[in-house]
């Protein structure tokens, strides 16, 4: 079975399509579950401060399990790892449905998500190679963003109708993802026979961090993707603060619609990157990264809804064009040095650490009373400067 997969590297192979379907259902469940669980917290009269804590336990699972999930992904067939990880998500969602403390259930979902991520991206490099890997990443990102859009809306709409029905729908989505994983052919483990002692696994993970950081291309990818996803999460919270101030709109729906425009743009940008960027021309994505910051700063000055929608769509397009080639570069180079699973686990550690750091700085700015518009302008300028510095650094490294 594995041999047939290795010879059929088409991005439309049965194995690849199964991965994409499983990813869509799993990401759909993740996003629907967030809004359904938030509705449950409100219905059970949890305090307002508990809502960000729910996101923190999810992100915290990524950071806590980062030293171990990469080795797990590389030590077993990645399709089976994905199936078990989705099973953990299913157990967490089902537990919340049955009355388990929502923070406990959501933590279990976070552990499943942490284990799932290195396997889902690592398997792309085993099902296809070379320039097709960029296209496969584009498909993965497009399915993820589509799931984010549909899952977020479905979770909110169903929760308004019936909270338990929304939670059951999330569990069914995870069950569908488990079923889709069964159709992924069983591939040979990438790096079997590694030590399972916690000390050895931790040491191995941090050795992988060092190896990837010392390589100019993978260091470039790690920093770029970390900056992008950290900025993306911060922008989501910034919109909630910015909309009432800049647009005078106080409902809860408008920030959600604006976030949706970013997601739609990412799908378009990811598709463009798949056609226009190869592993040999990854640096083509860097101007898009700089422009993200520029457009965020311009967006922050808007006072009308239509230009805001258009600029956020553009931000998403630039973001998709920027991040997809960087993901593909890390998978290809990481697979050859530390294993794709370990490479993605290191990437997850960097991205989630960046999320916590940027959200912390954002919260500090809000706490000291910096206006929302000023935060947006400063955020955009700093992001553009950071990506420009990364590009200059990468070009200097390449010239040595």
UniProtKB/Swiss-Prot annotation:
It is found in: Cell inner membrane. GO terms for molecular function: lysophospholipid:sodium symporter activity. It comes from Salmonella typhi. Belongs to the major facilitator superfamily. LplT (TC 2.A.1.42) family. Its main location: membrane. It holds the Pfam family MFS_1. Disulfide bonds: none annotated. The chain crosses the membrane at residues 19-39, 53-73, 91-111, 139-159, 164-184, 195-213, 227-247, 257-277, 281-301, 304-324, 352-372, 373-393. The keyword Cell membrane applies. NCBIfam families: PRK11195.1. It is a multi-pass membrane protein. This is Lysophospholipid transporter LplT. Signal peptide: none annotated. Catalyzes the facilitated diffusion of 2-acyl-glycero-3-phosphoethanolamine (2-acyl-GPE) into the cell. Gene3D superfamilies: MFS general substrate transporter like domains. One of its GO terms (cellular component) is plasma membrane. Keywords: Cell inner membrane, Cell membrane, Lipid transport, Membrane, Transmembrane, Transmembrane helix, Transport.
